[in-house]
Amino acid sequence: MRIFPAVDILGGRCVQLVQGKRESATAYGDPLTCARRWIDAGADALHVVNLDGAFGDSAKNADLIRGLVKETGIEIELGGGIRSVEDAARWLDTGASRIILSTFAIKEPESIRTLSQEFGSDRVMAGVDAKGGQVAIHGWQETAGDYIGWAQRFEQLGAGFLLYTNVDVEGLQGGIAAGPVRRLIGNVRIPVVVAGGVSARADVALLKESGAYGAVLGSALYSGKINLSEALEESR
């Protein structure tokens, strides 16, 4: 199973949010420095989110992210504020391994098919942000139907990966909710990366046992609650 340390970028800085709220941001310095820290500790993949994009400025941090992708040279999944096929193509041109489509994929599902056909399904990841079993969109403020149904639709449209985020536990460092993860993995055939609540070695073990492709480590990694080398060891 792959481990993806999170590098979330807001205003040119590496930050972590609680429950996706901008005002909760804790800054951890330069994004490239954070990325190198995790790579030096053994990471061979990163989960990069352009939070300025998620909050409305899709072009912000483009040069920074392009430099980060080039400098690190490892597997990178990239998301945050992608609102058009043109946006997605520009971010894929940075060299990121794959891009994450969330609200845009719900609003325009055919974009998954278009991008998968143009760039290959392995470079298209559909984001399934779930709140109480419903897909959450627009900064997790609205719901748009059963998360399993959407995951299956994204798979049928050609997405090569799914990113599942349990909004109910994201950023709280309280552990994952196993049931919804297992339900999702049991209902699709494409690889699933899990984010939200991964805060202990036992969470990594549970995700591996459940058949997840990968786990995103965010707040718990930056706070020191989970150790990257232990998570990597557990994932092997």
From Swiss-Prot:
Instruction: Please state what class of enzyme this protein is.
Output: isomerase
Task: Give yes or no: UniProt keyword Isomerase.
Answer: yes
Broad class of the protein's primary localization:
cytoplasm
What pathway does this protein act in? Amino-acid biosynthesis; L-histidine biosynthesis; L-histidine from 5-phospho-alpha-D-ribose 1-diphosphate: step 4/9
Q: Which UniProt keywords apply?
A: Amino-acid biosynthesis, Cytoplasm, Histidine biosynthesis, Isomerase
- In Pfam terms, one family for this protein is His_biosynth
Catalytic residues of the enzyme: D8 (proton acceptor), D129 (proton donor)
* Stated family: Belongs to the HisA/HisF family.
HAMAP family under this entry?
Answer: HisA
Query: What is this protein identified as?
Result: 1-(5-phosphoribosyl)-5-[(5-phosphoribosylamino)methylideneamino] imidazole-4-carboxamide isomerase
